[in-house]
Amino acid sequence: MRHMQSATRATLVCGSGVKQIIAKGHPNTRVFGARKARIPEREVLAAKPKITRITHLNLQPQERQAFYRLLENELIQEFLSMDSCLKISDKYLIAMVLAYFKRAGLYTGEYTTMNFFVALYLANDMEEDEEDYKYEIFPWALGDSWREFFPQFLRLRDNFWAKMNYRAVVSRRCCDEVMAKDPTHWAWLRDRPIHHSGALRGYLRNEDDFFPRGPGLTPASCALCHKASVCDSGGVAHDNSSPEQEIFHYTNREWSQELLILPPELLLDPESTYDIHIFQEPLVGLEPDGAALEWHHL
């Protein structure tokens, strides 16, 4: 009797051990005849295709009209005219401002110049690679004491961002939807020139162009826009005979003397180091025997 009880107890122990191994899913254990239970509800859910939810702003006419009235504000008009290159206020950035107003749930009475500059600054934060240009917004929004108050401005930006539930990404399709409501409005005709697309290399930057100017000062002259306007008008920027001479003549006058402009056909290896030597003009063009003179190092 005692032997039978011990045998039964051993069987129970062995049986419980097997259950534990199965429960743990031992990799070498395979149970024959076991099938996974089918759940019809899961099969139906898996068969349904994924539907991408498209969100619409659903801008009301009164909201669009209030925004257009805001754009006619004298300060904003002067600011937009200052941005002649459309680096910080092209049509897509302005469309993002209106989208931000809608997402933040602003009433039309809250369509103010300060909220405009805050939203425009946030739009530049999200979309623009060149971060220095957006600092021009500070003196327009804060006045002459912008150096003292710009930390508060950045807090306003963060609060505005939080009011939108941090949904600051606006797709191009959404911007096109905003502009399609009133496609002939002048704000949606502010196309950025192609020569101002993309980022600018550090050695091509003029540090004076990044310092905020603010109201009352003329915008910095842009050599690229000037040359493009001359070409668009059918004129000739310079009467040099060769394109290379035209490039050098133009850039030497417009850019800093510390900037070296190379011909477009000259390719340099960015991993290599080059020594630059500046030469003077030769004293005489040719030797009596026709051999060319060497240039003199400075």
From Swiss-Prot:
Which UniProt keyword terms apply here? Cell cycle, Developmental protein, Meiosis, mRNA processing, Nucleus
Pfam families with a match to the protein in the record: Spy1
Q: What is its main location?
A: nucleus
Indicate where this protein resides in the cell. Nucleus
Transmembrane feature ranges: none
Sorted alphabetically, which InterPro entries does this protein's record hold?
Speedy, Speedy-Ringo_regulator
Keyword Transit peptide recorded: no
Single biological process term from Gene Ontology: positive regulation of cyclin-dependent protein serine/threonine kinase activity
Superkingdom is: Eukaryota
Naming one, the record's GO cellular component terms include:
nucleus
Q: State one molecular function term (GO).
A: cyclin binding
Q: Where is this region: Speedy/Ringo box?
A: 61-193
Family membership noted in the UniProt record: Belongs to the Speedy/Ringo family.
The record's note on its domains = The C-terminus is required for CDK2-activation, but not CDK2-binding.
Give the protein's function. Answer: Stimulates oocyte maturation by promoting meiotic G2/M progression in resting oocytes, via activation of the MAPK cascade and cdc2-cyclin B. Also activates the kinase activity of cdk2; this activation does not appear necessary for oocyte maturation. Necessary for polyadenylation in oocytes.
Relate the assembly described in the record.
Interacts with cdk2. Interacts independently with cdk1 and with the cyclin B proteins ccnb1 and ccnb2, but doesn't interact with a cdc2-cyclin B complex. Prior to oocyte maturation, the mRNA is found in a complex with dazl and pum2 proteins; pum2 dissociates from the complex during maturation.
Any idea what this protein is called?
Speedy protein 1-B
Phylogenetic placement of the source organism: Eukaryota, Metazoa, Chordata, Craniata, Vertebrata
